[in-house]
Amino acid sequence: MVIGLLLTAEVSSLRQGYLTYGLGVGLGVACCYVPIVATVGAWFEHRRTLALGLAVAGIGTGTLVLVPVIEQVIETHGWRQAYRLFAVISGVLLLIAAVGARRPPVPSAAPGGVRDTIGGRPDFWILYVSSVFTSACLFTAFVFLADYVDTTGTSGSAALLLGLIGMSSIAGRLGFGAIAAKVGTIGLFRWSCLSLGLSYLIWVIADTSYPILVVFALILGVAYGGIIALSPAVVAELFGTVGMGGVLGALYTANGIGGLIGPPLIGTIIDASGYTAAQLTSVLLGLAGGVMLFMLRSSTPS
């Protein structure tokens, strides 16, 4: 990931950026995130959802803290320096995590591998397709919210809105993680996905009202945080913690597909029909992802 960020700082064309950031940083994130989440999930049993919520709260904290900082760095020193700063911060934090990590007291891989763990399990594919829809919905805000604020002439900071998404996602990760054990992990996960889709209706209503956009960012962030915190716990509940990293790795490719398909689709709709049609499409994507989860049932393997 550090190498990808440093190389991105040196690109001279957008195509090079696709390679260095999309492939380099993308592979780095995948190699870091999945093992970290799987390790935390394997270490804890009784308070797994809370532990996972705490672990992934760092993503929201990073969004909250670094977005305004990087925006300022770009304005004063340029985007190349911003990527270099990201590389340094990432390298230091990853080194600390690598030194402090310990193997969990359970086998790291299932005896038969991922294929045997998810083979013949329709619930995995329900989760997979749901994640494609949900990710496509989520990335609409991350990719197009700043452009929307600029295009519509809305009076307010787009960076602040993205920061609020990160801040409220921390509350979602911690809050949903804490209460999931009491109300049911899968049920709470369903409603997180449904809430994500429904939040885009607030964006439709907002038009150029910045205060309503703030409400949208906060609700979206809470729902997003719940999804991030609960998805590994759902995997642990359905498939167990043995080989959890492999199952999560397979499942998270759905997020990549959603992120790959969603923004171009939404961008095409914006160009053809405007933002309202794109926002409503995001509503449908989020609702589709949430509704599919009603086909899941809790079945923790022994």
What does each of the following model-derived ranges do?
Residues 157, 165-169, 175, 183-234:
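C-terminal transmembrane helical hairpin of 12-TM major facilitator-type secondary transporters
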Residues 65-77, 149-150, 179-180, 265-274:
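Interfacial helix-cap and linker-helix signal at transmembrane-aqueous boundaries
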Residues 4, 16-31, 132, 212-225:
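Hydrophobic core of transmembrane alpha-helices in multi-pass small-molecule transporters
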Residues 54-55, 59-102:
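Helix-loop-helix hairpin linking two adjacent transmembrane segments in secondary transporters
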Residues 30-44, 226-239:
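Intracellular juxtamembrane helix-capping segments at the cytosolic ends
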Residues 224, 238-275, 282:
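A late C-terminal transmembrane helix in Major Facilitator Superfamily
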Residues 122-178:
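Extracytoplasmic gate region of multi-pass secondary transporters
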Residues 72-88, 268-285:
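A membrane-interface helix-boundary motif in multi-pass transporters
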